[in-house]
UniProtKB/Swiss-Prot annotation:
It comes from Bacillus cereus (strain ZK / E33L). Pfam families: AP_endonuc_2. GO terms for biological process: inositol catabolic process. The gene is iolE1. This is Inosose dehydratase 1. Its cofactor is glutathione; Co(2+); Mn(2+).
Length: 298
């Protein structure tokens, strides 16, 4: 289905240890995490909170298992803090990823975000940016995009539950306000369906701008409970709203077909944060790998 050597398969370490709730998977070590990724048949991963920040140490650990770094999340605060604060941290992050050989930097605006708040209802309290904040966000992303390109990288914007860029309208507004040469899009199946959006619409409309893909499924019954009981994003994760592709309600056939027929080159990263005590990360990594092999031929 996919042209040879165009797509690499990664998996996020958040299934082993959760960055937002470190108590989930606290006993899972870095070495266990990357060893199980390799055993499950993946080519690489994104960066988790247990990963060494010393690139020499990290490269050696990954090379032993034939793994690469696909990218790493970066939180921007362009709507709520001075640009300089985000830029200073971004440059360190950019240089780290450049040294690790990554080609994209995942960015997500966390100004007013409720995704990390345990007791704030997800759908009821979703932030909405003012026009001034939208302008700050777009201008700031252009600045970060230029900084990324100084080292040959691209920023990919991660639309995300509980943030100011979550819905179809918000994604469209951000894409309209930003330069395609400087700001690309991360396509995440799970966050779109969780929000009630139509993922194929976003995929088709912004296909040329999509430079990174997160493969994530959802358990609809948990999402329904989150809405009915006004739960937070973190409570949704703990209750199992997300799972690996093939284990939930999202149909991936057309997603894979559209991407295979496009010029997409880059990573597919399985990112399915859930409680590792309830969903063994190695078992679910194997499940995801088998599904992708069957559906995408990768």
């Amino acid at each position: 289905m996919f042209k040879e050597n165009t797509v690499k398969l990664g998996i996020a370490p958040i299934a082993w240890t959760n960055d937002d709730m470190p108590e989930l998977g606290a006993g899972n070590t870095f070495e266990q995490c990357i060893s199980e990724m390799a055993l499950a048949g993946f080519n690489g991963s994104e960066v988790g909170n247990k990963y060494p920040r010393n690139t020499v140490v990290l490269k050696k650990s990954l090379a032993l298992r034939n793994l690469e770094i696909a990218s790493a999340w970066f939180s921007t605060f362009l709507t709520t803090k001075p640009l300089e604060e985000t830029v200073e941290e971004f440059i360190k992050h950019r240089d780290f990823l450049h040294d690790m050989g990554a080609k994209v930097i995942v960015v997500s605006e966390q100004g007013h975000s409720i995704q990390g708040l345990m007791d704030v209802p997800l759908f009821k309290n979703k932030p909405v940016f003012t026009e001034e904040e939208w302008n700050k966000l777009a201008d700031g992303l252009h600045h970060l995009g230029k900084l990324a390109q100084e080292k040959g990288l691209h920023i990919v914007y991660h639309h995300h539950m509980g943030t100011g860029v979550q819905t179809t309208a918000e994604i469209e507004k951000l894409m309209d306000m930003t330069n395609p040469a400087l700001v690309s899009l991360l396509f995440d199946t799970g966050h779109l369906v969780f929000s009630g959006e139509e993922p194929l619409y976003i995929l088709k409309k912004y296909l040329p701008r999509i430079k990174h893909v997160h493969l994530k499924d959802i358990r609809q019954e948990v999402v329904d409970t989150v809405k009915e009981n006004e739960l937070s994003f973190l409570q949704a994760v703990k209750n199992g709203a997300f799972t690996v592709p093939g284990d939930g309600v999202i149909g991936f056939d057309e997603v894979f077909t559209i991407l295979a027929n496009s010029d997409y080159q880059g990573w597919f990263v399985v990112e399915a944060e859930q409680d590792p005590a309830l969903a063994n990360p190695f078992e679910y990594a194997l499940k995801a790998r088998k599904f992708i092999q069957e559906k995408a031929g990768l």
